[in-house]
Amino acid sequence: MPKYVLRLTHPPDQCPTANAKTRKILVEGASAIPELAEKLKIKFLAGPLILGTEHDGIAVVEADSVETVQEFILQSGLVQWNSVRVSSARTLPEAIEEMKRVPPPLY
């Protein structure tokens, strides 16, 4: 199943440690994440993890498609106070196998 890395970032004034509205959204919404993920058939491989005091978060998920991941981001409300980057990811063995389909090296 395809893997995706989600990188979330927000400005300090939107951080749940500083903003009462986003704090409420986070506290109330966090418990709904597993149920929403199950509904959309998304499996968390790592995270969600909060990266210290950097105003960033990260998660690694498996999902049928990037559109499913985007739907999760929308329905969870994460997009309301985070900028979210979604990148496809491969294991190292998968990436090595994929290189066989790349044209010969340029250098």
Identify the function of each model-found stretch.
Residues 1-55, 64-68, 94-107:
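Short S/T/G/P-rich N-terminal loop/turn motif that feeds into the first structured element of a domain
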